[in-house]
Amino acid sequence: FRRTDEENRQIMDRFDAERIHQILGDEWVILIRMHPKFPVENLPQNKYCYNMTDYNDITDLYLVSDLFITDYSSSVVEYALLDKPILLFAYDLAEYDRGFYFDYENMMPGQIAHTQTELYELLQNNCDNLPKRQNFVKFQYDNMKGDACGRILDILG
């Protein structure tokens, strides 16, 4: 994960949990889990926002969530299998220099917000994109036939 401690702080400067709470309402709770290698101090924490960075098993958090907001995390590959909405907050996409395995804009399994304003608009409206998510799951998982070791041994002769 390329983000430094300083860059993680910048992410949280752009992720306004209070504004998101206003948009979603009191029936929603925000669980924030930063990359564990780069924890961020002073994450918002109150009755509607919890820092889950130290929580060991992210898959538990997937199961209790109704929506996943992330940037470039590979976690979307697992989360997409749950068939729940995914929102991608890629405010620095133009500067992101690690590259992707596929076309991020067209292949990722959710709507992409490039700015805070876009993030808030997607949250206010229906940010779900079922066809995009279904295509992503098909792309990621349909070619898994099992027996990878056997196929490698066959290739090696």
Question: Residue ranges of each PLM-predicted region?
Answer:
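Conserved catalytic-core segment of nucleotide-activated headgroup transferases in glycan assembly
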Residues: F1-N42, A113, C149
